[in-house]
């Protein structure tokens, strides 16, 4: 069989079928969508995530060694942690993570923040020490 007769018997049709073209376009669009889903352009929306109660320098400056537990509760509110293994220490913890909107808008003063204030008491419930004042915003 010569090459010419083989070409005639193959029944080659030009690629004009509309349904085949439609399949290629749909497959291409789906491929691009799947590829783009891994990019940051189509990221998941994240909310601002504040956890705990924020404490300011103004509040912390009202704390003094010699205060009782009720006075500390009045100024700062309930602590985030009252450790059963160390009952003479109260931990005030605040953590903030900026969400999608703050990042997209590029707000300069919105950033992730973390605070950890520790208040120590003696056995009579009187403040003996305060740690973590440097982690509080001004």
From Swiss-Prot:
Signal peptide residue numbers: 1-42
Membrane-spanning intervals of the chain: none
Cross-referenced Pfam families: BamE (PF04355)
InterPro entries: BamE, BamE-like, BamE_dom
Signal listed as a keyword: yes
Molecular-function GO terms, alphabetical: protein-macromolecule adaptor activity
Keyword Transferase belongs to the record: no
Keyword field: Cell outer membrane, Membrane, Signal
Subcellular location: Cell outer membrane
Major localization listed first in the record, in broad terms: membrane
GO biological process, alphabetically ordered: Gram-negative-bacterium-type cell outer membrane assembly; protein insertion into membrane
Source species, domain of life: Bacteria
Family statement drawn from the similarity comment of this UniProt entry: Belongs to the BamE family.
Quaternary structure note: Part of the Bam complex.
Protein name, entry field: Outer membrane protein assembly factor BamE
Species whose genome carries this gene: Psychrobacter arcticus (strain DSM 17307 / VKM B-2377 / 273-4)
Designated gene of the protein: bamE
